[in-house]
Amino acid sequence: MTLLDTDLDDVPAPQGQLTLKLLASRQDTNVYGDISGGWLVNQMDQAAELAAGREAGGRTATVAIEAMDFLSPVRVGSMVSVYTELQEVGHSSMKIDVEVWVRALHEQHPDERQKVTEARFVMVALDDNGRIRAVHD
């Protein structure tokens, strides 16, 4: 089962490895007071880069986001956890599923987690000169 084939009810727990954990703050909000989607994409990109870098043993870059779903808004004060799972390794590229889960620390049930965003990132391994190289060279 892949990220894009699942439904929220099918997989009620995070898939993959916890890669980033941070607090959503007021400076990251849009004009309506919710955390900006762009901020979430930035965190997901950083997590995908960390996961790809672990696999490739060095520098990587994002070449595509194949699919992304924003499932629910994120509120200020939420604890944001970004999970990554390596799905496929090609010659020079890697496909990484990224999920964002939140815990709303200020709500009545602060232990409840909710998936708010999911995406598949395509990353490539780079050499020291910024040229594409084999993932496992």
Language-model features and meaning:
Residues T2-A64, M123-D137:
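Hot-dog-fold acyl-thioester-processing enzymes
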Residues L3-D10, P14-L20, R75-M79, Q87-D137:
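HotDog/MaoC-like acyl-thioester-processing domains
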Residues N42, S78-V82:
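N-terminal, well-ordered alpha-helical segments
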Residues V63-P73, S81-L86:
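Conserved interaction-surface patches within small, structured recognition/assembly domains
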